[in-house]
Amino acid sequence: MASLFKDPTKLSAYRDRRFTGTQEEYEAALQASVTVYVGNMSFYTTEEQAYELFSRAGEIRKIIMGLDKNSKTPCGFCFILYYSREDAEDAVKYISGTMLDDRPIRVDFDWGFEEGRQWGRGRSGGQVRDEYRTDYDPGRGGYGKMVQKELEAQRELVDYGGAFQPNAPPQYDRGDRKRGYGDSYRNDRDYQRKRYRNDERSSQRAPDSEFKRDAIDSEKNPRFREKGDSDEEDDDYDKRRRR
């Protein structure tokens, strides 16, 4: 059961990679520091809320909110600077694990704030832990940044017709027949193709049909005259009709 609790000999559960000294120097800085690091905060927790909670441990000198380096908005952590070491110890002892803005927060000793540490270190601007997080956390922006990018890419692919959209609203024609978005386009395209083929066939058959029509007219018209016919034959035909 001892593994369920913090090691009392360790002042902090993490080691800041920006600290340039040795491990011994790092631990010495933690023992003398009046700064605590607060993690697992909601993106929507304000500085006033943090002040109200941490002032119960002692008088606060300064609060530095952690910010997304791109959007300059809170990204889930902060630094609390006290005036005394005793107050910092009380904050770690009594406030770590309590609820702030409906979230259990983590409080650790910090070796001391320096300019630049207020910015998130993740590739997307926020904290590294929020880059590849696959669980949905509404207090920290939903899914992790990389997961959100994948979801946005899938939505864009669907919007541009690159993938099937299962929830697309159906369309109805006059016969109340369901069809997808692409059916009207395909029907129009097929119609144009059929019309083009019919026109092409009609143009190819036009000379033959005209020739047949002329031949029929020539059979019905007794006065249709072939080559070599003379006006005398027409006169004989008129005389026979008058008789």
Swiss-Prot record:
GO terms for cellular component: cytoplasm; nuclear cap binding complex; nucleus. Gene3D superfamilies: 3.30.70.330. PROSITE patterns: RRM. GO terms for biological process: abscisic acid-activated signaling pathway involved in stomatal movement; alternative mRNA splicing, via spliceosome; defense response to virus; mRNA cis splicing, via spliceosome; mRNA splicing, via spliceosome; primary miRNA processing; RNA splicing, via endonucleolytic cleavage and ligation. Component of the nuclear cap-binding complex (CBC), a heterodimer composed of ABH1/CBP80 and CBP20 that interacts with m7GpppG-capped RNA. The keyword Ion transport does not apply. InterPro entries: NCBP2, NCBP2_RRM, Nucleotide-bd_a/b_plait_sf, RBD_domain_sf, RRM_dom. Belongs to the RRM NCBP2 family. GO terms for molecular function: RNA cap binding. This is Nuclear cap-binding protein subunit 2. SUPFAM superfamilies: RNA-binding domain, RBD (SSF54928). Keywords: Cytoplasm, mRNA processing, mRNA splicing, Nucleus, RNA-binding, RNA-mediated gene silencing. The gene is CBP20. MRNA binds at residues 14, 37, 106-110, 117-121, 127-128. The keyword Metal-binding does not apply. It is found in: Nucleus; Cytoplasm. Residues 120-144, 161-243 are annotated as: Disordered. Residues 34-112 form the RRM domain.
